[in-house]
Amino acid sequence: MAYNHKVIERKWQHYWKENKTFKTLDTTDKKKYYALDMFPYPSGQGLHVGHPEGYTATDIMSRFKRMQGYNVLHPMGWDAFGLPAEQYALKTGHNPKDFTAKNIKNFKRQIRSLGFSYDWDREVNTTDPSYYKWTQWIFEQLYKKGLAYESETLVNWAPDMMGGTVVSNEEVVDGKTERGGYDVYRVPMKQWSLKITAYADRLIDDLDDIDWPENIKEQQRNWIGRSVGASIRFKVAGQPDDTEIEVFSTRPDTLFGASYMVLAPEHDLVEQLTTPEQADAIKAYKAKIASKSDLERTDLNKDKTGVFTGSYGINPVNGEKLPIWIADYVLASYGTGAIMAVPAHDDRDFEFAQKFDLPIKPVIAGDNDYDQQAYTGDGEHINSGFVDGLAKQPAIDKMIDWLGEHHAGEKKVNYRLRDWIFSRQRYWGEPIPVIHWEDGETTLVPEDELPLRLPATKNLEPSGTGESPLANIDDWVNVVDENGRKGKRETNTMPQWAGSSWYFLRYVDPHNREALADYDKLKYWSPVDLYVGGAEHAVLHLLYARFWHKFLYDLGVVPTKEPFQKLVNQGMILGDNHEKMSKSRGNVVNPDDIVDQYGADTLRLYEMFMGPLEASIPWSTDGLHGANKWIERVWRLMIDENNRVRDRITTINDGKLTKIYNETVKKVTEDYEAMRFNIAISQMMVFVNEAYKVDDLPIIYIEGFVKLLSPIAPHLSEELWSLLGHDDTITYATWPTYDESKLVEDTVQIVLQVNGKVRSHAEVAKDMGKDELEKLALADEKIQEFTAGKTVRKVIAIPGKLVNVVAN
């Protein structure tokens, strides 16, 4: 009978659900393995075929490790707050809570249909008050430690998006929001921020202790951007002595080459330093660049722009006057928001100096045409007074000493990383548990009153004040304490990154009402052994989660410094036209359709066989057909037309499959460990091909093969396991072992030559000696044919390789 995927997959999914097959116990007498997927945002579109790739990888590892005797934690949940639900609610009038619940139901149905071995008793949802109670609790601990603060911050403000909201730098493209294309402006606004910068050094240094792709580590290092240099203070001509411009430079040794200064247009001193003659030009320039994101402003390929303020800085090392400009390539958020420009030795400064005809002063010796380019190489210092003749590092050290002695600067470590802007002007997010009182005091909502619940409302229209829609709910916003003091709740909500920064901890103990998770359980399960998800989260989610985890470690809440020991980024499944799948391109493949037509096991097998897990590969319907045919081929190998185990599966073992079976167990085990699933599948295909060539199939090998296959094709394997006479699920069957001695052939093929030319071959015992080899060669028909009529002069036998008959 043909393999009926619909009946068989439904049968085993029901069995797993009813028997809670994948329920995880918090036992400590077994080794643990924690396999985690980046939990999805439950969008209205549901899963696409890209989602199951990563989920299948973690599921294979989870099933594999269970059979190896590990206690496996493999959970799933929902990152369910976020902008799309709120936008949909505004557009349609639906409540985001109901919309999200409906989407989760659909996602869960789809995920169950793919046979993933999640423990659904541990499901978490970031929008559940019992979950975000602890998100709020973490915020309160950050606040108590001085790591959550409110300040006037320059933000990307999109006034027409959701009635006005802040978006991150990563969400801005060409002065517009990535989602929706709304205009973005840089404006100062009171925002909550988290002091991630306090953890900058640890976030860099501890990358050495985790098994992550090197490119992700490098992205995090670059994002944090640690650099060592000097803080240098410049007086301003015509200004009081206490008016100083502070500059951070990694090359203080080039101070003699500074020929102008540049401030970010948003720098606090711009207004004070702008002369009346330059005021209009400065104002116009600031308006012009207001909609540019930081990424656009620092684009190396863009044309340099700027305006002179009319003021001059004083170079502390030689007293020279340096014109002070503003330009958008200097960011208020990086360093001090001011630079000393050394155009002879910096490409951006050189371009700017050339455009505005500013002096270019070489201070490092090198063969260079300064009419054409800056010299950015190393060399001895020239035109540099007391550092003349010195190489780079000695000159830096000497200059820093000089600055310190003259109270004009000191050594400093700087970071590109900025504090994390933590507030959003949206409804659908975790309320920030803060009250602002009429007397100016700000307090936290008492811990015993958490969670501060997000109030239900039908009015999601913008407040009109730049605040979130929560500002419209008077009876929620306005509070009075026991002394009659009036206050207002914080109306901004947390960003979507909040709930995803600690969810992996809640899976360990999801129903705990007294703590975010029990410490002893965390000690058993932490850290996550395998984390699989997209590389696009390199510098946001993954950095934020590491920051929160380190903070919780410092509090004594978690036992490890790092949350995720091993990270794997699955590649992208592209459309069959090699483009990214998207609704607009019309190339999205719905997994529901594939499961219905071919079955979940076919989809799982195909996605793992497409290529290396990390590679981005186009979808191929032909490849899908091939995977489906192989599933049926495995079925036919073992099961006859009457749905019974074939008679050729027997206890008899004639040894014909011994070597290939042991090779297959060894190779598949090693390839699973290394997550080379495509290569493991290739080896299983080789075994099936060999199995079709023999008359008898030893049941011990067939059962072993079914175990090897089960992590990838669990429904097929459960059915075969059952038909082979087993009452229990294959889930906890013992992983097969191999015999190293069986991997070595007893026989070897040797070459038979006449006068050095190959004339024949022979299969011989591996340990056959020289005398026997000579006799065998001389008795070979082909050798006799080529030596007929000739005299054999010599026979050279090399055991295990060849016999050469010399004749003439």
Curated annotation (Swiss-Prot):
Single Gene Ontology MF annotation: ATP binding
EC assignment: 6.1.1.4
Cystine bridges: none
Residue numbers covered by motif 'KMSKS' region: 580-584
Cellular location(s): Cytoplasm
EC class (word): ligase
Alphabetized UniProt keyword annotations: Aminoacyl-tRNA synthetase, ATP-binding, Cytoplasm, Ligase, Nucleotide-binding, Protein biosynthesis
Protein name: Leucine--tRNA ligase
Gene field: leuS
